C-alpha cells in the first residue's frame, strides 16, 4: 500500500455585483468652528444623496460617521511661530448594486473640494459567492482525484482511494480583470465636478483548494 498526498485546486470567475466606496469629507481651517462648518455642510449633502440612492435601490447598504475635529501645528518658515491648524472630518461608506449610479455619484462629489473618494472595493452578492465557493470546492476535489490517479498510474499502482481530506486556510474572493480599486479609484475623485465617472466592474475570482490523502 502506497500513500499519495496531493493538493487539488480550482477557480471560478463571475462579474462583480457589489461596489463599496468610502467618501471622506475633510476641511482645514484656522478655527475649529470654520473647519466643522465646512465639513458639516459637505457631509450632510453626501448623507442626503446616499439616503436617496438607497431609497432608489442603487445602494444596498450604507452608514455615516459623525464629524469630528483634530488639530496639529504646521511649520510655516524659519524663525516664525508654528501655525495651529484644525481639521474636521467625516465619512460615508456605501455599497452599490448599480455601477452607473456609483459613477454618477463620484462625478457629483468632484464638484465639492471637501470630498475625497477612497478606493472602490468590488465583491459578489453573498448568494453568488456561496454558490461559486461550493462549486469550486467540488472541482478542487475532482482535481485532486485526477492528480492522484495520474501518480498511481505512473507508479503502476491500483486505483487510489481517499483516506483523508484537509482544507487549507481559505483564500478570499479577489478582483480579476478590469475590477478597479485602491489608488486608481482614488484618482477618480479628481474628475470634473458633475461629470459621471466610467467604472468597469470586471470579474471576481473565487478560489478553492483541498489537500487529499489517498492509498493505492
Question: Which sequence ranges carry the predicted segments?
Answer:
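Short, charge-dense linear interaction motifs
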Residues: 1-216
Amino acid at each position: 500500500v502506497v500513500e499519495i498526498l496531493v493538493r487539488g485546486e480550482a477557480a471560478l470567475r463571475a462579474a462583480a455585483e457589489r461596489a463599496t466606496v468610502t467618501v471622506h469629507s475633510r476641511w482645514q481651517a484656522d478655527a475649529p468652528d470654520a473647519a466643522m462648518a465646512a465639513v458639516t455642510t459637505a457631509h450632510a449633502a453626501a448623507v442626503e444623496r446616499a439616503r436617496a440612492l438607497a431609497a432608489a435601490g442603487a445602494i444596498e447598504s450604507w452608514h455615516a460617521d459623525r464629524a469630528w475635529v483634530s488639530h496639529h501645528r504646521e511649520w510655516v518658515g524659519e524663525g516664525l511661530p508654528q501655525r495651529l491648524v484644525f481639521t474636521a472630518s467625516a465619512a460615508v461608506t456605501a455599497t452599490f448594486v448599480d455601477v452607473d449610479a456609483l459613477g454618477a455619484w463620484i462625478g457629483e462629489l468632484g464638484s465639492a473640494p471637501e470630498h475625497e473618494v477612497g478606493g472602490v472595493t468590488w465583491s459578489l452578492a453573498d448568494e453568488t459567492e456561496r454558490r461559486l465557493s461550493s462549486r469550486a470546492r467540488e472541482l478542487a476535489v475532482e482535481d485532486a482525484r485526477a492528480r492522484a490517479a495520474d501518480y498511481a498510474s505512473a507508479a503502476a499502482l491500483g486505483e487510489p482511494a481517499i483516506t483523508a481530506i484537509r482544507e487549507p486556510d481559505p483564500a478570499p474572493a479577489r478582483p480579476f480583470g478590469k475590477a478597479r480599486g485602491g489608488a486608481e479609484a482614488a484618482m477618480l475623485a479628481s474628475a470634473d465636478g458633475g461629470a459621471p465617472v466610467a467604472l468597469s466592474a470586471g470579474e471576481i475570482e473565487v478560489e478553492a483548494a483541498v489537500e487529499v490523502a489517498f492509498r493505492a
